[in-house]
Amino acid sequence: MSLTMADGVEAAAGRSKRQNSLLRKQLALAVRSVQWSYAIFWSSSLTQPGVLEWGEGCYNGDMKKRKKSYESHYKYGLQKSKELRKLYLSMLEGDSGTTVSTTHDNLNDDDDNCHSTSMMLSPDDLSDEEWYYLVSMSYVFSPSQCLPGRASATGETIWLCNAQYAENKLFSRSLLARSASIQTVVCFPYLGGVIELGVTELISEDHNLLRNIKSCLMEISAHQDNDDEKKMEIKISEEKHQLPLGISDEDLHYKRTISTVLNYSADRSGKNDKNIRHRQPNIVTSEPGSSFLRWKQCEQQVSGFVQKKKSQNVLRKILHDVPLMHTKRMFPSQNSGLNQDDPSDRRKENEKFSVLRTMVPTVNEVDKESILNNTIKYLQELEARVEELESCMGSVNFVERQRKTTENLNDSVLIEETSGNYDDSTKIDDNSGETEQVTVFRDKTHLRVKLKETEVVIEVRCSYRDYIVADIMETLSNLHMDAFSVRSHTLNKFLTLNLKAKFRGAAVASVGMIKRELRRVIGDLF
């Protein structure tokens, strides 16, 4: 009896392996026949009835060439699909620096011990399409959810164009498809599950194309079924000869079913034990060595929410990290400072600091830290001056101070003897005793600045000196202004200047700043 059970388990294991191998070949042949990017078989979950999860897949996209090229693209596609699956399971275990040892050989699916050449597959080596294919492995779909769920519930084929722009309710991987340039996705029911195919091109619905895909799937399935039936008949006849008396066909069917379940559960627990615990947090094994799981009916809805949340977390991490991998940049946690990666942002920042340096008169340093420190000090000084002025507004001291300031301005006059603009006064000549008329020219220095949007009107009246107009023009240029109208004249060594200018660029100086810079040029008379 023990020999019979062992033979049943071995037979079930062989059937499971052949079925997976057959399904991979079917998907590979179908996706290669139409030259699409990938094919996925979403199978029914054994732990959650009605839920679709990853069953098998075949990647046929533009794979990145690593160290060598391969003659058979078909066989290389099968091997690449296995490598991506292994990489996903390794990443799911929590190893952020995952590298998977891969093998490339004659790719005989029935014999895994053939001679091979070992290579290392890292997440850094994946293209956008390969990332799309890998992240899709983490998705599960409840009944009528997204394309696979709807195709399974309705039993109809769903053809989606412009998948990268589809709503999240219809196609939850639309954002991921946009980064991978996946434009067309097709889903149709098959063997109790759903087959999904995708391509980076925009292809309208074509019934002939669907018939071609389904015929490729059925062609391999028909040949394999004939071989399986012959092998099954031989195996059953052998088992019947080994059965002891008193065991019926129903007992044999029961034992064969149990063997199949045990083999499938053991296979999944050995390979994807951590994956199952991660994806099904509400399912707990009855004991460490058991192949069965217990579940609670009330926790199924919560489990669905956790599945969706986990998929979104994986998608968010991929979308955030993959662009940094391809551009060979450091991760944000390793960067220090602001705007180190973008030259345009750094240039704009330097321009703003240059404008800030010109606006603060006491700043002569070049480094940004000194500019900011001096700017803070200057603002504190201005704040103190404003508080002082507000405190003395309306007081007697303020009125007296204002009167003295006016007197000081009136004392800044230019007295010159001339034939016009004079006051009647007398000057006594000590030698002759005669009196003569003297012209006293009185006027005060005047400065007026009027700002309207980007145009500035400046009126200056002050004592004349050499190159004073050139100095004024240079000051305006340092303030990022260009003069377009200048009128000036000099009378009795007194300059009158009317000037109009416009600002260059977006930086606009204040009226107070313009007056302060012009006062330096005019001199102490103001």
Swiss-Prot record:
Organism: Arabidopsis thaliana (Mouse-ear cress)
The UniProt record lists the keyword Nucleus: yes
Induction: By cold, UV, flagellin, jasmonic acid (JA), and salicylic acid (SA) treatments.
GO biological process, one term: regulation of primary metabolic process
Taxonomic classification: Eukaryota, Viridiplantae, Streptophyta, Embryophyta, Tracheophyta
PANTHER family recorded: TRANSCRIPTION FACTOR MYC1, TRANSCRIPTION FACTOR TT8
Assembly and oligomerization: Homodimer. Interacts with MYB75/PAP1, MYB90/PAP2, MYB4, MYB5, MYB6, MYB23, MYB82, MYB113, MYB114, TT2, MYB0/GL1, and MYB66/WER.
Record Pfam families: bHLH-MYC_N, bHLH-TF_ACT-like_plant, HLH
The name this protein goes by in its record: Transcription factor MYC1
Tissue: Mostly expressed in developing seeds. Also detected in stems and leaves.
Function: Trancsription activator, when associated with MYB75/PAP1 or MYB90/PAP2.
Biased segments, Polar residues type: 332-341
Major localisation: nucleus
Location in the cell: Nucleus
Primary gene name: BHLH12
MF GO annotations: DNA binding; protein dimerization activity
Domain bHLH: 333-382
